[in-house]
Amino acid sequence: MSKHFFLHNEFHWQGRHDAEDGAAGSRVHHVVQQIDYTHIGENPYGVALLGFACDAGVARNKGRIGAKKSPDLIRRALANLAWHSPHPLYDLGTVVCDDDLLESSQQHCAKIIAEVLPCVPVITLGGGHEVAWASFSGLARYFEQHHPEKAPKIGIINFDAHFDLRAFSSSQADVKPSSGTPFNQIQHYCQQQGWDFHYACLGVSKASNTRALFERAEQLNVWFVEDKDLGSVNHDYHLTQLQHFIDDCDYLYLTIDLDVFPAATAPGVSAPAARGVSYDNLAPFLDRILAHRDKLMLADIAEYNPTYDVDSQTARLAARLCWDIANAMNDKLEHQ
């Protein structure tokens, strides 16, 4: 148990061991190090993993709960993947949100991210997509503490079937922060700080977002591409648009909601997609983002819900995405 009451670090990393291969047979479970986040400065190279076990945001958004169980199951799927980098992974544990204590849990998560980012990049494992507000809050704290002299140009790239731009405050009692509000919260924060709001949402479903949400996205100048338009026919055009978006930003925050994938690929989510975007169609966009690893500071994977998974296939998808991102972040370290 971590000495921090809100942070659990009890996962036991284990997996296949091929003794005959020696060091060349390394897998994630061989190289991951479980450490206290306050000691991260003693470990200057690598990538940090942080869990965010939370159902509160999805429950508030009237969704199917179960994502609270996901961080350790993603870790389990990640453990056996081969590891080729000379740099390790650091497991900082999991921030656990009990009951409806969403806001305090998000602040705990943000605090850890802000303290770790000066040393290593971070991948957060949700939890519902309320993790995005926690992640961005940590990134914002980092800039406020270490680079207060200049407003950062942060590009937020969200692979998601939903805009997650719902209202988070209202005179109506049931309107409050949830898994459906994080990017509206981020926009509000940026407006208060005088920061530009650079938000891209790729894979959005017209069937799953009301006209009010599309109007909100247009009002905020969100660059979005619908799920039906992310096919291979349109790759070159949209990849060019993505490159322009990246070029206009100094830093990148990548967030992946697993419900962007078809239900057949990712059944284990709160809101499975009838259409979605195939991994093959999404991969060129992810690869383009990861090619700009020098700008990528932070990423998270959200909305895995093991209650509805089939043969752990969504867990394996989440683990592979985490693996891809972590390898790109470690490649950045090798080229510094």
Swiss-Prot record:
Mn(2+) 2 binds at D160, H162, D257, D259. Signal peptide: none annotated. Its EC number is 3.5.3.8. InterPro entries: HutG, Ureohydrolase, Ureohydrolase_dom_sf, Ureohydrolase_Mn_BS. GO terms for biological process: L-histidine catabolic process to glutamate and formamide; L-histidine catabolic process to glutamate and formate; putrescine biosynthetic process from arginine, via agmatine. SUPFAM superfamilies: Arginase/deacetylase (SSF52768). It is an enzyme of class 3 (hydrolase). Keywords: Histidine metabolism, Hydrolase, Manganese, Metal-binding. Belongs to the arginase family. Catalyzes the conversion of N-formimidoyl-L-glutamate to L-glutamate and formamide. PANTHER family: ARGINASE/AGMATINASE (PTHR11358), FORMIMIDOYLGLUTAMASE (PTHR11358:SF35). This is Formimidoylglutamase. It comes from Vibrio vulnificus (strain YJ016). The gene is hutG.
